């Protein structure tokens, strides 16, 4: 059975902890169950929650546990419709998809050592979102909708933005787009072209990992940035899939 939840406590028996769960529960903490554009569901089989999912403007994040009913989920999406579906490859639906690598880290580094030789650097944990948006240079993402969502999450402590500045100028930025309990999902890591290969990106990522008590997850393209993140203590832990 798949049912929409109207009370966040209906997810209390969900014990799985992965990148999909962090995304879903952070979104639930941000918006609750009162909005039509953010809805949440659970699949129950023999009294056990076997899957949970969120739909934000029709884009789905799906978290799975052992014994989930794939065919019931497929029927659900066929009836309700969907945009993208972000999930583990264990879920199968007849649609085109992209795949990449999930990495995670619980490593905490000595920033004094990492920052040795970096003159005039400072980390801003509350940057102006307009400046951050312009620096990241999002494609196909209008500022208003991005600002409304990220600022709402920041106010509810389920997201956080960071910039690394040199002489008052942004050289590197990143966003924890989902924070739940002690874990988080790191996104939008960008370093200005003229400041690359100088250690700034690695310093900011390590700063952010130190700021989170538990585990930090990232999703990366299969062929990109593996050495950058492994050098910072991240490990490959799985594959993400996004159906379109």
Language model features: what each stretch is:
Residues 90-99, 202, 222-240:
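Conserved active-site alpha-helix within GNAT-family acetyltransferase domains
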Residues 48-49, 54-116, 218, 240-244:
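Acyl-donor-binding surface of acyltransferase catalytic domains
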Residues 68-77, 191, 197-211, 227, ...:
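Conserved acetyl-CoA-binding loop-helix of GNAT-fold acetyltransferases
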Residues 164-165, 177, 200-211, 218-221:
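Recognition helices and adjacent regulatory flanks at domain boundaries
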Residues 130-185, 190:
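A mid-sequence, solvent-exposed acidic-amphipathic segment
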Residues 2, 17-78, 170-187, 193:
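Conserved donor-binding loop and adjoining core beta-sheet/short helix segment
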Residues 40-44, 161-165, 217:
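Cytosolic beta-strand hydrophobic patch enriched in CBS
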Residues 1-24, 108-145:
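Short amphipathic alpha-helix that is part of the acyltransferase structural core
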């Amino acid at each position: 059975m798949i049912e929409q939840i109207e009370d966040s406590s209906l997810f209390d028996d969900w014990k799985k902890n992965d990148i999909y769960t962090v995304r879903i529960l952070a979104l639930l903490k941000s918006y609750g169950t009162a909005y039509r554009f953010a809805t949440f569901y659970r699949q129950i089989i023999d009294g056990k929650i076997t899957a949970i999912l969120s739909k934000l403007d029709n884009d789905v994040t799906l978290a799975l546990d052992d014994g989930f009913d794939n065919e019931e989920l497929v029927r659900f999406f066929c009836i309700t419709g969907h945009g993208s579906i972000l999930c583990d490859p264990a879920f199968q639906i007849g649609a085109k998809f992209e795949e990449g690598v999930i990495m995670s880290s619980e490593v905490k580094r000595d920033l004094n050592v990492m920052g040795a030789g970096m003159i005039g650097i400072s980390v801003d944990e509350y940057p102006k979102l307009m400046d951050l948006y312009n620096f990241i240079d999002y494609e196909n993402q209008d500022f208003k909708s991005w600002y409304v969502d990220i600022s709402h999450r920041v106010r509810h402590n389920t997201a956080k933005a960071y910039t690394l500045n040199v002489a008052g100028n942004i050289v590197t930025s990143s966003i924890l787009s989902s924070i739940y309990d002690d874990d988080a999902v790191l996104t939008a890591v960008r370093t200005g072209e003229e400041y690359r290969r100088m250690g700034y990106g690695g310093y900011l990522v390590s700063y952010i990992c130190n700021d989170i008590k538990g585990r930090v997850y990232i999703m990366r393209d299969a062929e990109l940035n593996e050495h950058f993140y492994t050098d910072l203590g991240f490990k490959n832990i799985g594959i993400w899939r996004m159906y379109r």
